[in-house]
Regions:
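Substrate-binding/catalytic cleft of secreted carbohydrate-active enzymes
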Residues: 1-206, 221, 226-231
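Beta-strand-rich structural segments
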Residues: 206-210, 361-378, 421-424, 434
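Extracellular/luminal low-complexity segments enriched in Ser/Thr/Pro
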Residues: 310-312, 408-415
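Extracellular Ig-like/FN3 beta-sandwich strand-entry sites
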Residues: 316-320, 362, 417-419
Length: 440
C-alpha cells in the first residue's frame, strides 16, 4: 500500500497517465488487500480510474476497469477473446493490458520470416481488438526489448518482446503502429526481396506497411500495380498491412505469346505460386494449367522458365523493386529494394545540445548499418568503434557489435561548457561524426 501511495504522489501530475494499476502483477484475488489499494488510489487521485493487471478471467472486480493480459493469439487463433468471456462485470470497461510479448519473441537479427510474422501478429491483435466495440483498448507487450531474469531471454537474460530493440531502434513490427498516425509518412516492405533468404527461394507473403493514400510498385522501373488501404484484409485498421499479390503486372501480355485474357490467368497463377512453391501448386490452379497446356502446348519446362524470369529473379540482371507512397497525389516516400551494393553507417542523436542543471546531461545515439537506399541490413553484425572528443564522454564500451544492423550508445556532458564530437568508425561501413554543444 505504501508503494502505491508513493507511486501516485510522485507521478499523478503526468498527463500521459490514464489509469492506476492497483493490483500486484498477475496476482490472484485478495479482496481485503485490493479494497485498500483502490481506496488509496481514489483518495490520492480522484480524477483517474483504477485497474490491475490480471492473468485470470472472471476474477473479482474491485477496480473501475477490468484489465487482463490476453495472450490468446498464437498466429492461428483469434486475435483476442471477446469481453464477455473475460470480465466478471460486462457493465464496466474492459482493457487488454498485454498481448503478444512472450508468445513470439523476436530479435532484430532473426530471419525474415520471423520478423515479418512478428509484425503480422501485432496487426492481427490490433485488428481483432478494433473490431470489438466493447473493448476499450489494448496495450501490446511491449515497446522495447529489456534485460530480464534467468527464466526469460535466450540464455542472455534479454527479453526480445519489444517492437524496438533496447536502443529504441524499430523492428519491423513497429511500423504496424506507426502506420496508424497521419503526421509522419510511413512506408515499409516486410521483405528485402532476396530470394536466398527463404527456404526453397520462395519469399512467401510480403506486405506493404504504409499510411499513404496508395503505394505504387515498380519492378525494374516497370509499373506493376497500385495498392490502396481498402485492399488490406485488416478491415478494422485504417492502414492495415496490404499483401503484395502481383510481381508481373502486364509483362506476360506485352512480352510473351499469350492473349490478354490468358496472360492474366497465367500471371494470377504464377503470383499465387510465388507465395508458396513451384513444387506444390494448389489444386485450384489445375484447370488454368490444363487450359494453357491445351491452348499453347506449354509444358512444365516452359512454365519453370517463365516463373524464373518473372518471379524467381534468377540469372538475369539484378532486379530492382521500387515502392512509391502517394499522399494527396504526391510521392511522400520511396523504398527501393535491390541486391546490396554498398554499406554505410547512419547515426542519430536524440538531442545534440547537452544542458546541465542538477546533474550531467545524457543523449542516446542510435546507430544503423544501411544499404545505398537507406534500408537497414538485418544481418550486419560487424563492430563499430566509438570515440568521444572534446567536452563529452561515452557511457559504455568504446567498441560495440551491431545486432540486426542496429545498435546504440550514450553520450554525457562533463560538467563544463564547450563542444564535443562523437566519431563512429567501421572497417566496412565507413565513419560518421556527430557534433555536440554543451552548456553548463
Amino acid at each position: 500500500v505504501q508503494n502505491l501511495k508513493e507511486m501516485i504522489v510522485q507521478y499523478r501530475n503526468h498527463p500521459s497517465i490514464i489509469l492506476w494499476g492497483v493490483r500486484i502483477n498477475e496476482s490472484p484475488d485478495d479482496d481485503p488487500f485490493y479494497e485498500k489499494t483502490n481506496a488509496v488510489a481514489h483518495k490520492l487521485d480522484p480524477t483517474r480510474p483504477t485497474g490491475g493487471v490480471r492473468a485470470i478471467k472472471k476474477s473479482h472486480l474491485l477496480e473501475d476497469v477490468y484489465t487482463y493480459n490476453d495472450f490468446l493469439h498464437d498466429g492461428k487463433t483469434p486475435g483476442c477473446d471477446p469481453k464477455k468471456k473475460v470480465t466478471s462485470d460486462t457493465d464496466k470497461p474492459y482493457l487488454i493490458s498485454e498481448y503478444n510479448g512472450h508468445m513470439y519473441p523476436t530479435k532484430a537479427f532473426d530471419n525474415e520470416e520471423r520478423r515479418s510474422e512478428h509484425a503480422i501478429r501485432h496487426a492481427n491483435v490490433l485488428d481483432a481488438v478494433a473490431g470489438q466495440e466493447d473493448i476499450a483498448g489494448s496495450f501490446g507487450w511491449c515497446m522495447f526489448d529489456y534485460n530480464t531474469h534467468k527464466d526469460f531471454g535466450s540464455g542472455d537474460r534479454i527479453c526480445y518482446h519489444g517492437v524496438m530493440d533496447m536502443f529504441r531502434n524499430p523492428k519491423l513490427a513497429a511500423a504496424i503502429y506507426a502506420c496508424e498516425q497521419e503526421e509522419t509518412p510511413v512506408l515499409q516492405i516486410t521483405s528485402s526481396m532476396d530470394i536466398g533468404e527463404h527456404p526453397g527461394c520462395n519469399r512467401g507473403n510480403i506486405y506493404i506497411l504504409s499510411n499513404a493514400d496508395s503505394v505504387k510498385m515498380y519492378k525494374n522501373d516497370r509499373f506493376i500495380k497500385e495498392y490502396r488501404p481498402e485492399m488490406s484484409l485488416y478491415k478494422h485498421l485504417k492502414h492495415g498491412p496490404i499483401l503484395i499479390d502481383d510481381f508481373i503486372g502486364d509483362a506476360l501480355e506485352k512480352n510473351e505469346r499469350f492473349r490478354p485474357k490468358h496472360a492474366k490467368e497465367m500471371a494470377d497463377a504464377m503470383n499465387i505460386v510465388a507465395r508458396g512453391s513451384l513444387n506444390h501448386i494448389p489444386k485450384r490452379l489445375y484447370p488454368t494449367a490444363l487450359k494453357l497446356v491445351l491452348l499453347y502446348h506449354i509444358d512444365f519446362a516452359e512454365v519453370t522458365k517463365l516463373y524464373t524470369k518473372y518471379i524467381g529473379d534468377w540469372g538475369g540482371t539484378a532486379t530492382v523493386y521500387r515502392f512509391d507512397a502517394i499522399k494527396d497525389g504526391k510521392v511522400i516516400k520511396s523504398v527501393t529494394k535491390e541486391p546490396v551494393n554498398g554499406i554505410r553507417l547512419q547515426a542519430e542523436a536524440d538531442h545534440t545540445n547537452l544542458t546541465e542543471h542538477h546533474s550531467y546531461d545524457v543523449a542516446l545515439v542510435r546507430i544503423r548499418a544501411v544499404d545505398a537506399h537507406g534500408n537497414v541490413l538485418p544481418f550486419y553484425q560487424e563492430p563499430v568503434r566509438i570515440t568521444a572528443e572534446g567536452d563529452i564522454a561515452i557511457i559504455g564500451p568504446d567498441t560495440i557489435a551491431l545486432q540486426g544492423g542496429m545498435g546504440g550508445t550514450y553520450v554525457k556532458s562533463l560538467g563544463r561548457s564547450g563542444q564535443g564530437t562523437l566519431l563512429l568508425r567501421s572497417q566496412t561501413a565507413g565513419e560518421i561524426k556527430i557534433p555536440f554543444q554543451v552548456t553548463v
